[in-house]
């Protein structure tokens, strides 16, 4: 298989695109470094802390969307089951549980291999998908964590409630 040579031309940092997106939408943000930016977005159910990280070694823009719902140790196994049931339904991105901190988050990445540059539309779509997915399943996580429901009960109840909204 022939190798393809790519020119090492300077590229626009994808986090510059994300920063412009945050500024245009008047979202609070903090640029911790050239490779990381965190945006605060208010949702219907909770506030979201969205961190974008540029991973130059694999040429990917990683998104992690966390929300304030700590999972107590006694509910982690059921939340893990719920995450598995939800992730089966998702076409892109996935939920994760950071066990050491009991923190839930939605993760996704945009691969920009070969010098491809991120567009505003791509960064906006990445964020939109994360927020929509978190909003859709937030109540399921609440039902398991706070109401003591099983993963299946929580998912069924949340999907029923969501389908009833206009």
What residues fall within each predicted segment?
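Ser/Thr-rich, low-complexity intrinsically disordered terminal regions
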Residues: 20, 24-48, 52-63, 68
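Short, intrinsically disordered, mixed-charge
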Residues: 23-24, 81-89, 128, 132-139
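Terminal, regulation- and interaction-focused segments at domain boundaries
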Residues: 1-20, 66
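Long, contiguous binding/interaction regions
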Residues: 98, 108-110, 116, 122-135, ...
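Short, internal acidic amphipathic alpha-helical interface segments
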Residues: 66-103
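Short histidine-centered catalytic/ligand-binding loop motif
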Residues: 6-7, 64-72, 116-119
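Short, highly charged C-terminal tails/helix-capping segments
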Residues: 142-166
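Long, hydrophobic, amphipathic alpha-helical segments used as structural scaffolds
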Residues: 33, 91-94, 98, 137-149
């Amino acid at each position: 298989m022939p190798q393809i040579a790519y020119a090492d031309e300077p590229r626009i940092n994808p986090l510059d695109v994300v920063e412009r997106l945050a500024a245009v939408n008047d979202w609070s943000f903090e640029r911790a470094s050239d490779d990381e930016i965190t945006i605060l977005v208010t949702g219907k159910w909770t506030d979201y802390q969205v961190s974008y990280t540029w991973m130059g070694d694999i040429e990917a823009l990683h998104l992690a969307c966390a929300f304030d719902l700590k999972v107590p140790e006694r509910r982690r196994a059921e939340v893990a089951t719920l995450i598995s049931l939800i992730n089966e339904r998702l076409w892109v991105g996935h939920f994760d549980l950071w066990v050491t901190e009991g923190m839930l988050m939605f993760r996704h990445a945009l691969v920009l291999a070969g010098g491809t540059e991120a567009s505003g539309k791509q960064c906006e779509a990445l964020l939109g998908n994360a927020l929509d997915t978190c909003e859709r399943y937030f109540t399921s996580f609440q039902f398991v964590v706070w109401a003591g429901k099983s993963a299946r009960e929580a998912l069924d109840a949340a999907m029923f409630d969501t389908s009833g909204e206009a």
